[in-house]
Amino acid sequence: MPRIFVPVPSEALWYVGSIMEAGAEPMVLGLPMDLPIGGVALRREWVADWAEVFCSSNELDALLLSAAEPAELAGLLIAALRLDLPAVVVPTEDPFSVALAALGFAPLLGDAAEIAVELARTGRPRPSELVEGFSLANALRAGLASGAGPELLVHLAAIAREAGVVGFPQMIRVLAPESPEVAGSSPFEANGAAGLVAHLGDALHDTLTVTGRLKGNLPSPVPAPQAAGPRLVFVRGRASGTEIVCRGDEGVTEISGDCHFCSSEEAAVRAVESGAVGTSNLLVVVGCGPRGGPGLFRLDRLGGALREADLNIPVLTDGLAPENAVGAWASLATPEATMGGVVGRLRDGDALRLDLTEGLVRTGAKADEIRSREPFPLPASSGLGYAARYAHATLPALEGAGFG
């Protein structure tokens, strides 16, 4: 009897009965609750290692995957890649699930449990057959069209690296600016995730999925989206090698302001709540990157504080913008502050302009002055455990922010 891995708590638990009815044995195990303190990439790596150990010691035939957070789901998928065990992702309506549908793992048609049991019996397709350059391009475009933010780039880069796909960071830089969020939900309302993927049209590659070829699972025709929404734009500092991912609404040409520098998310939240940040400020928040977090912090608390204060100001960080971020966010600043990046040498009052049209970083401070400033200090030791090992070995965000 085939054995199917089912993680809990997740929506996969609802499919246990269907797995048994299809003639397979569900192997239910709870996701780790005691995660190391850190950001989304650190949690992803922890879940990947945990799932790999469990699955490799339990003679499983396939995996039925679901999780509450994209980081956890990406970790489970990375474990499937390491073991090359057939995997099916339970489809949901969130942007990361739409990306995984375009990648080939979340079925656009059929019952996820029945598909997982069929894959367990046949052994195909395996994750190594699904993850390749064209399917990753599909996933990137579909995820961004459905409203995903920069976190999608990080997890897809980690999946690409695990699969041995070369050149994905360069693909991100080319395709992301060409892939705006769909403004208006007509494709999704008409046909769900399949409609949203189908609206990509000729940009979509007909890649292999858990239910056959991708285009064979799509409706045709689909309603055209109403308009182009926000998109991701890369800006760079030529001399410093700085690179920043900006979220730009249609028609916005720059992100600018006088810097208010904060050395952590906690400091930034305090500054917002105390009224120390004004409407002319650009809030700079550092120490949140892969090494500084450690693990790449998503600034959800700061996003909440800004909403509570009804303060619509731009934010620049070496971490991640919060989910459903509104306004101008510039994130994943690389090199991060703890790696000597320019973002860690900015100071209160510096005039900063991120030119979204030219793709350039412009500052009122001279380059020599910035270089002469004290760099952002290395974080205090994260101890001797998993987080410390991660902080020592982590890769940059657009390379997946995994272990190097």
Question: For each predicted feature, which ranges?
Answer:
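Catalytic or ion-coupling anion/metal-binding cores of large enzyme and transporter domains
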Residues: 1-32, 37-43, 73, 79-84, ...
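A short, small-residue-rich loop immediately preceding and capping a beta-strand
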Residues: 6-7, 55-76, 89
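Short, well-structured alpha-helical segments in soluble
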Residues: 46-58
